[in-house]
């Protein structure tokens, strides 16, 4: 909108556009907003600049585009946010993944000395091992939605810090399994509580990111910190060799040192998060966790709220930039129900079900699949061949996600990645040579990499525009919670859980079908997004229309001299 109106005949303009005569409009609203009359008593709007009260249509203002200088400022602002936010989230997710992966490593650490978790755990049996693995997902799924919804009530960075803190505490408590108090029942309980502690982390991180970046800038950045999982898988294997050297030090087994050290590091990082991550813009209904805890005055000086991040000018620009994501809108419980019943959520769940199920199935049984491809491979060979598959996964993320953010072709990039997975599964199943089949595993890893970040970014952007905070929190929790049932299917019903499939080829065929389901669900999601079918209107949208009518009137005013602007 121009700051100064063109020098045209005001009389003719009023005659040609009688509905655009602001004095008449102001008279109709002067009873409720007397101050508006003084601001607009001499202003006439040209219909080429603005469409206001036109033939009874809803009041709208043409969206103000960013100027070239503002676009350059936005680039610098996003870089500033990247440098502050991404490293913290990457380290956070890396440490949480390390604590998750260390449990499986403890089964084989220091086996020659008889000091592995399996060898030292009282009452151990294969039944308890499977039960512990299953209950991890049960705890994760049950508490996923309530944990993520807490971010709509409590400042997100505080809740993320709480999640990481409990992950570190429960992870460190696994060291108890090597003492006289440890037994199979305590192992099962700790696995369950680790799932409860981790619930809400992955969707919570995506929710937090959606409060800082628009949907078109979200996918690449989710992919950046998602690479922490792949790096963690390789890192814990290498670092575990060092922990095995510590076996017997101060009377502790090697795996006990591993649990303790990773847990303490995670706890330390969790305590730094409130000062490291910037606070999300919020309304008065969101409370800080510290507001419920009485603190002495000297501690208030160390409050995270006192740590500055954005300048007032940056905050103003960011507010305009992030407006389409409906950050901080006041919502009602009916909006939560609407977001859960929105038809778009359920295709996302099926998309996530297929890709995460196949991903966890392949990666959990990857060493066994490599061994089946060539039984002559030694244990060291298998370990060395396992790492490149994770690296291929990370390569897929850093290669595809920048292109995804650049071209915004959600359906094309997701289905393209899924087709690479299907091709990889087919090669791993039916290629005549062992190394060709191993190449199929690399293809699977590359294709799987970008699928989860695309799914999360797409869901965040779609639901934020319709339901705001509560829509993002609830939908991401449902997608990751129910979608992780795919992991249960592939982990326990396929591969080693399928007695009639010793070569794993039937399991790979089922995985191809699961990826096919993800592709079909992606097509349905694309159509629902385009047509708007199955969506509901959030309660805050009705309130916003009333507010916008008043806000537009305050925005439409003639340019004032600098002295008068200062008074205003």
From Swiss-Prot:
Region named Disordered: 547-568
Subcellular location, principal: membrane
Gene Ontology CC, one term: plasma membrane
Keyword Membrane: yes
One Pfam family of this chain: MFS_1
Gene3D superfamilies: MFS general substrate transporter like domains (1.20.1250.20)
Subcellular location, record wording: Membrane
Listed CDD domains: MFS_FEN2_like
Keywords: Biotin, Membrane, Symport, Transmembrane, Transmembrane helix, Transport
Bilayer topology: Multi-pass membrane protein
Function description: Involved in uptake of biotin and desthiobiotin with the concomitant entry of protons.
InterPro entries tied to this protein: MFS, MFS_trans_sf
Chain ranges passing through the membrane: 85-105, 123-143, 158-178, 187-207, 222-242, 257-277, 345-365, 384-404, 411-431, 439-459, 470-490, 508-528
Lineage, uppermost ranks: Eukaryota, Fungi, Dikarya, Ascomycota, Taphrinomycotina
The protein, known as: Vitamin H transporter 1
GO biological process: biotin import across plasma membrane; dethiobiotin import across plasma membrane
Top-rank lineage group of the source organism: Eukaryota
Gene Ontology MF terms in the entry: biotin transmembrane transporter activity; dethiobiotin transmembrane transporter activity; solute:proton symporter activity
Gene of this entry: vht1
Family under the similarity heading: Belongs to the major facilitator superfamily. Allantoate permease family.
């Amino acid at each position: 909108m121009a700051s100064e109106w063109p020098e045209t005949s005001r009389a003719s303009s009023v005659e040609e556009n009688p509905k655009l005569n602001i004095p008449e409009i102001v008279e109709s609203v002067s009873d409720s907003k007397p101050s508006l009359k003084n601001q607009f008593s001499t202003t006439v709007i040209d219909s080429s600049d603005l469409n206001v009260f036109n033939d009874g249509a809803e009041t709208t203002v043409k969206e103000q585009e960013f100027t070239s200088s503002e676009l350059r400022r936005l680039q610098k602002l996003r870089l500033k946010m990247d440098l502050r936010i991404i490293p913290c989230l990457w380290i956070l997710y890396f440490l949480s993944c390390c604590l998750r992966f260390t449990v499986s490593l403890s089964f084989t650490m220091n086996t020659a000395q008889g000091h592995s978790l399996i060898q030292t755990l009282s009452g151990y049996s294969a039944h308890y091992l499977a039960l512990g693995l299953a209950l991890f997902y049960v705890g994760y799924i049950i508490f996923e939605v309530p944990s993520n919804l807490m971010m709509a009530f409590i400042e997100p960075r505080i809740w993320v810090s709480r999640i990481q803190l409990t992950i570190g505490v429960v992870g460190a408590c696994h060291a108890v399994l090597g003492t006289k108090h440890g037994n199979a029942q305590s192992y099962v309980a700790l696995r369950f509580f680790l799932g409860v502690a981790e619930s809400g982390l992955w969707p919570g991180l995506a929710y937090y990111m959606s409060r800082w970046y628009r949907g078109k800038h979200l996918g690449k950045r989710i992919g950046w910190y998602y690479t922490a999982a792949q790096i963690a898988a390789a890192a814990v294997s290498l670092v575990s060799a060092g922990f095995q050297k510590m076996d017997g030090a101060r009377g502790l087994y090697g795996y006990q040192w591993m649990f303790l050290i990773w847990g303490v590091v995670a706890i330390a990082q969790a305590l730094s998060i409130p000062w490291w991550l910037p606070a999300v813009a919020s309304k008065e209904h969101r409370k800080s966790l510290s507001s419920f805890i009485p603190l002495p005055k000297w501690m208030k000086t160390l409050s995270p709220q006192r740590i500055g991040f954005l300048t007032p000018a940056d905050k103003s620009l960011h507010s305009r930039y992030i407006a389409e994501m409906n950050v901080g809108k006041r919502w009602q419980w009916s909006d939560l129900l609407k977001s859960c019943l929105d038809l778009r959520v359920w295709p996302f769940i099926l998309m996530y079900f297929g890709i995460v199920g196949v991903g966890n199935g392949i990666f959990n049984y990857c060493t066994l699949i490599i061994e089946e491809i060539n039984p002559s491979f030694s244990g060291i060979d298998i370990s060395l061949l396992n790492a490149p598959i994770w690296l291929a996964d990370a390569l897929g993320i850093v290669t595809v996600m920048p292109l995804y953010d650049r071209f915004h072709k959600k359906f094309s990039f997701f289905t393209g990645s899924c087709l690479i997975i299907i091709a990889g599964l087919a090669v791993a199943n039916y290629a005549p040579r062992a190394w060709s089949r191993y190449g199929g595993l690399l293809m699977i890893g590359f294709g799987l990499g970008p699928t989860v970040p695309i799914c999360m970014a797409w869901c965040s952007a779609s639901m934020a525009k319709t339901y705001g905070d509560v829509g993002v929190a609830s939908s991401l929790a449902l997608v990751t919670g129910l979608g992780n049932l795919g992991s249960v299917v592939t982990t326990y019903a396929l591969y080693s859980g399928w007695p009639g499939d010793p070569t794993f080829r039937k399991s790979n065929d089922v995985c191809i079908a699961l990826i096919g389901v993800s592709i079909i669900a992606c097509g349905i999601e694309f159509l629902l997004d385009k047509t708007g079918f199955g969506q509901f209107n959030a309660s805050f949208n009705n309130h916003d229309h009333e507010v916008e009518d008043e806000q537009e009137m305050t925005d439409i005013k003639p340019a004032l001299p600098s002295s008068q602007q200062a008074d205003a």
